Curated annotation (Swiss-Prot):
This is Non-structural protein 5. Homodimer. Interacts with VP1. Interacts with VP2. Interacts with NSP2; this interaction leads to up-regulation of NSP5 hyperphosphorylation and formation of virus factories. Interacts with NSP6. Participates in the selective exclusion of host proteins from stress granules (SG) and P bodies (PB). Also participates in the sequestration of these remodeled organelles in viral factories. Mg(2+) binds at residue 92. One of its GO terms (cellular component) is host cell cytoplasm. The keyword Phosphoprotein applies. GO terms for molecular function: ATP hydrolysis activity; magnesium ion binding; nucleotide binding; RNA binding. One of its GO terms (biological process) is viral genome replication. Its main location: host cell. The keyword Magnesium applies.
Amino acid sequence: MSLSIDVTSLPSISSSIFKNESSSTTSTLSGKSIGRSEQYISPDAEAFNKYMLSKSPEDIGPSDSASNDPLTSFSIRSNAVKTNADAGVSMDSSTQSRSSSNVGCDQLDFSLTKGINVNANLESCISISTDHKKEKSKKDKSRKHYPRIEADSDSEDYILDDSDSDDGKCKNCKYKKKYFALRMRMKRVAMQLIEDL
């Protein structure tokens, strides 16, 4: 996108401020001095005021407006800064002003060049595979298979032998049934814990 504006053909402005030449301002940028002076050329504004006041309101038309009147024309002189790769910034000036022959034909040149190139080619390829293969994970391979513990031996008909008793004193004691019930519950709890692990 490029934007170009012709500064030399701006509309005219009528004001009493433009009687005197403005002082040139100097700014410093990266150690280099860049100057710019602007000069506004305007005739006596009092003569224009007398001219406008001497006419009746009915006689004032578009040709008497401030933008089209020769008395309010001005020009801007600016110093052009030239750059040199070896010498840096120099203060050689180039003066350019608007000619007075274009009074009444103020124009603002506004050119807009805009180029947009859009490549909207879109290619998409979607493939969906529904084949599902179940593979054993490393955790399954590393898991050890413990032998299942059966509790069929714990029954009411089981009779303690001499090796399970304390000197054979508990072979037919009254706590035999409670002991085997407790032993069965403990074994089931142990089996459940092993399965959970």
